[in-house]
């Protein structure tokens, strides 16, 4: 594994995973949101906001996220200082995102959009994560993890906002 391969792995994994989410989310929401809101009433606000995003809106939201990952990869390919840390932070955030899907599937005891690619990509994401762990210090991993999660927490609502606006 090299930093460039890690960036390519992240790009490819993201395209596959978000492709599955984009293709499946709207139909899955229509079939399952009422049951989930009944079982988990505290999630009603979150689910109702996601239900208003069309497949086109999800695709646009995923494209916005892809631009961020692609920009980090390009920076790495061009040799921009610290770009490996940015790619590592985004890779770790992607792994956290995958873990969230696995937890959702376990809680719901059913398929959730993104689960299939999570399972198929597990060997590749573990390989990438092992590379990061072997390459960075514990402090660097902690900083990259925190930064990646913050970027994910800030950008995801923004991406969903764009998706909702362009779904109307």
Protein language model annotation of sequence segments:
Residues 1-11, 72-86, 127-143:
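Helix-coil boundary and interhelical linker segments in multi-pass alpha-helical membrane proteins
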């Amino acid at each position: 594994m090299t930093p460039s391969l890690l960036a390519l792995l992240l790009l490819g994994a993201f395209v596959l995973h978000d492709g599955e989410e984009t293709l499946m989310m709207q139909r899955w929401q229509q079939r399952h949101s009422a049951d989930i809101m009944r079982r988990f009433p505290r999630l009603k606000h979150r689910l109702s906001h996601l239900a208003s995003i069309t497949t086109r809106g999800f695709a646009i939201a995923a494209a916005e996220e892809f631009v961020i990952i692609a920009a980090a990869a390009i920076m790495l390919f061009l040799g921009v200082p610290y770009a490996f840390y940015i790619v590592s932070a985004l890779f770790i955030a992607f792994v956290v995102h995958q873990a969230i899907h696995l937890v959702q599937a376990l809680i719901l005891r059913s398929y959730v959009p993104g689960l299939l690619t999570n399972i198929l990509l597990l060997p590749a994401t573990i390989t990438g994560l092992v590379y990061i762990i072997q390459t960075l210090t514990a402090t660097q991993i902690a900083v990259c993890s925190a930064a990646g999660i913050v970027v994910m927490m800030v950008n995801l609502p923004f991406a969903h906002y764009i998706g909702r606006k362009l779904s109307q």
